[in-house]
C-alpha cells in the first residue's frame, strides 16, 4: 500500500486530467456537430456538382454526416467515461479515437491521390450530360441547367460544346445558357454566356472542398490530444487504484 501522502499527490493529477479531458471532450463533441452540419450543407449546396461525378463522389457528404454522428456519440461516451473515472472505458475511448484518426488519415490520403480523377470524372460526365440533355428534366439535365444558371456559363469548355449535341440541332442553346431570360432565337451565340462551366465548377469545388478538408484535418489532429489525455487519465486512475491496494 502506498503512503497517504503519495495518494494525495495522485488525486490532484487525476482531477486536473479529468477537467482538461472534459473540456476537450466537449470541444470534440462540438466538432462532431460541425462535421455533421458541413455534411448536410455539402449535400444541399453541392448536390448539383456531385450528381455529375461518379457514385463514389456523391457519398462524400454522407461520409461527413456519418463521421459527425459517430463523433457526437463518441464524445458523449467520452464525457461519461471521464465523469465515471473508469480506466477501461477511457482506454476504450482512446482506442476509438485512434481508430477514427486512422480512418480519416487514410480517407485524406485517398482523396489527395485521386483528386485528378475527380476532375476527369466531372468533365467526362458533364460532356455526357450535354450529349444526352433534354428539357424534360432528368437529374443530370437538371444539374446542367442549375450549374449554367448559377454560374452564368455555357457548355464544358465554352458555348460551342452545345453545337455538337442533338438538343442544339433541334432547339438551339438551352435557356440556361441565355444571358437574359428570353434569348430568342436560341441559336444566336451573342445572346448566350460564352464561358464554359468546367473551370468555374472546378474552382468552386476546390474552394469548398478545401474548407471541408481543412475542417477534417483540424478534427483529425485534435483527436491526437484526446488520445493522449484519455491514456494519461486512464493510467493515473490505474496507478491510484494500485496505490490504494
Swiss-Prot record:
Residues 41-59, 115-208 are extracellular. Keywords: Glycoprotein, Membrane, Transmembrane, Transmembrane helix. It is a multi-pass membrane protein. GO terms for cellular component: plasma membrane. CDD domains: TM4SF2_6_like_LEL. The chain crosses the membrane at residues 20-40, 60-80, 94-114, 209-229. Glycans are attached at residue 134. Residues 1-19, 81-93, 230-245 are cytoplasmic. Its main location: membrane. It is found in: Membrane. Gene3D superfamilies: Tetraspanin (1.10.1450.10). This is Tetraspanin-6. It comes from Pongo abelii (Sumatran orangutan).
Amino acid at each position: 500500500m502506498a503512503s497517504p501522502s503519495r495518494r494525495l499527490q495522485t488525486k490532484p493529477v487525476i482531477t486536473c486530467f479529468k477537467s482538461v479531458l472534459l473540456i476537450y471532450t466537449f470541444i470534440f463533441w462540438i466538432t462532431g456537430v460541425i462535421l455533421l452540419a458541413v455534411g448536410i450543407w455539402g449535400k444541399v449546396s453541392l448536390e448539383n456538382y456531385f450528381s455529375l461525378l461518379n457514385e463514389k463522389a456523391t457519398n462524400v457528404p454522407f461520409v461527413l454526416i456519418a463521421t459527425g454522428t459517430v463523433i457526437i456519440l463518441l464524445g458523449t461516451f467520452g464525457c461519461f467515461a471521464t465523469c465515471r473515472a473508469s480506466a477501461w472505458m477511457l482506454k476504450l475511448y482512446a482506442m476509438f479515437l485512434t481508430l477514427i484518426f486512422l480512418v480519416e488519415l487514410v480517407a485524406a490520403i485517398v482523396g489527395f491521390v485521386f483528386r485528378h480523377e475527380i476532375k476527369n470524372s466531372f468533365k467526362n460526365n458533364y460532356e455526357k450530360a450535354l450529349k444526352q440533355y433534354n428539357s424534360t428534366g432528368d437529374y443530370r439535365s437538371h444539374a446542367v441547367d442549375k450549374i449554367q444558371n448559377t454560374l452564368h456559363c455555357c457548355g464544358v469548355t465554352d458555348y460551342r460544346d452545345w453545337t455538337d449535341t442533338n438538343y442544339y440541332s433541334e432547339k438551339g442553346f438551352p435557356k440556361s445558357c441565355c444571358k437574359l431570360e428570353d434569348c430568342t432565337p436560341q441559336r444566336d451565340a451573342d445572346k448566350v454566356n460564352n464561358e464554359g462551366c468546367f473551370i468555374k465548377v472546378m474552382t468552386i469545388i476546390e474552394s469548398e472542398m478545401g474548407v471541408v478538408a481543412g475542417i477534417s484535418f483540424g478534427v483529425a489532429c485534435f483527436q491526437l490530444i484526446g488520445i493522449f489525455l484519455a491514456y494519461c487519465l486512464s493510467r493515473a486512475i490505474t496507478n491510484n487504484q494500485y496505490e490504494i491496494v
